[in-house]
Amino acid sequence: MYSLMHRDEPVCAITIDTVSGAIMRVSRPVNPELLPLGGCIDSAALKKWWQHRAVPIGQGKIQRILEQLGITTPQEYLVRNLGLSLTDHYWIKPLDMELGWGDINLFTNDFRDPVGDMQLGQDVNEILELPANAFSPSSSVQGELKKKWIITDGKRCLIKGNHGSNSQESLNEIVATLLHKKQGKQPFVTYNTIRFDNTQPIYCVCESFTSDELELIPAIDIVDSKKKNNAVSYYEHFIAVCVAHGMAEEAVRSFLEYQILTDFILTNTDRHLNNFGVLRNTKTLEFVSMAPIFDSGNSMFWQNPKLPKRDDLTKIDVNSFRRKEMQLLVYVTDKSAVDLSLLPTCDELREIYEKDPLIPCLDSILLGYQKKIELL
């Protein structure tokens, strides 16, 4: 038996299957206001929330790594790490152990990430077991790309890899950082390049924007926390829930419109509802602000570097509030939210991408970038 905890406050008792790591039974919450926002409707939703909290089995080499370590499922690995995350302040407490948030949280306690080491290059066969009583954030890190958490100068930083042999996705994050820095209008995560040796691709690294005071509530949890009227779009529903939690409607709208416009310019096709959200005060549960823009790697035609025709540039599929990129522009009421005169030049982007000579069709990528700007 475990208690689902939010910091040092119990939320509800849960029974977890010792083999699969799945939640089998959920008791009546003792503090229902502390339930995870997206898992507060019923026990089935909480079980689903727990399942989605675990590292995806398709992330990098995670399946092979877990097999090597004798771990059956990602949820079992999550249980071994007490459900801890560097995204929020939820965890599970064994009922027979005296533990507190201060003893185990990853924000103020040092940790190592041996699974992350294996994800980013160390031979999987070199790690035969994980250190006992040492918790790691790798059991709850999300996304398909291989990742590793490190602590540098006391800061929690995430290193992120790429699909395939070139470094375009990591360099896309550098491009997005430059764009947002030059605009200076909305909060964003700063990415830098990192390389372990010349035999490996360029990776990107960023500092965590959560802390022991602030946690991320993903947009998917926000829209799922309240029943949506069928006549209302998910976009408007998200805004309405944020406003109901005390956020200023104008601030939410201006952020979303800026994000839509910059994603359009960068051809970021993967702004799904786990890739943006709200920062919440972990003690008062107040919605403080929109989380800074992060995760723009799936952009700049990275899956199709050969320049599509102009007509094709208006038919790009996306994973977001709408299925087509052009449809998202309908939500934008103020295109001056982005200053086109301050966008990075093609020469600036070329300098970034030329760090990796393996990136194909660079001229076509830059031409596509120019044409997308012209569409605005």
Please place each PLM-identified region on the residue numbering:
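Canonical protein kinase catalytic loop motif
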Residues: H272-G277
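Phosphate/dinucleotide-binding and metal-coordinating scaffold of catalytic cores
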Residues: M1-L261, I265-T267, V278-L376
